[in-house]
Design a protein with these regions (language model features):
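Conserved small/polar residues in nucleotide/adenosyl-binding loops
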Residues: 144-145
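Surface-exposed acidic/polar loop and edge beta-strand patches at domain peripheries
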Residues: 1-139
Length: 145
């Protein structure tokens, strides 16, 4: 898994673009304090299967969708059941999709990393369940403040 580590001031961050651009670690290096729940070395497989329980995942659409389907604007959307016990789709179509780092730069006071994901008819992983072309862009920034 490709990881992007970046630091500014007292903070170091670790971003995994290939798993939903999840910022899985944020550490205050001066205090030695972990800010986010990051996967331990023995939890890598858990992270791959359940990325929404670590870091700052993108959870679009959020929450749970009962029976894996809903209707909006006269159109019914169907998602795979991801929680069999409660029979619903759970937390988002982007959480494990491969984002690409589109830009990384530093200003005097900030370090920024921008990741993008494009969904279109050629991307069966999402388009099958959510047949809309869209672009998701997320920028993580760490500043001195």
């Amino acid at each position: 898994m490709q990881a992007v580590e970046f630091s500014k001031g007292d903070y170091t961050a670790l971003l995994i673009p290939g798993m939903g651009a999840n910022l899985i670690r944020l550490t205050n290096t001066r205090l030695g304090a972990e800010i986010l729940r990051a996967p331990a070395d023995d939890e890598v497989e858990t992270f791959k299967g359940r990325p929404h329980v670590f870091g700052l995942p993108i959870l679009f659409p959020p929450n749970r969708i009962e029976d894996g389907r809903y209707t909006f604007g006269g159109r019914t959307y169907r998602f795979p059941i991801t929680n069999a016990k409660e029979h619903h789709y759970h937390h988002g179509i982007l959480k494990s999709q491969p984002f690409a780092v589109s830009k990384a730069w530093e200003t005097g006071e900030e370090v920024l990393v921008e990741c993008r994901y494009y969904s279109n008819a050629g991307n069966d992983a999402i388009f099958r369940d959510f047949p809309h072309e869209f672009k998701c862009k997320i920028t993580d920034r760490k500043s001195v403040v």
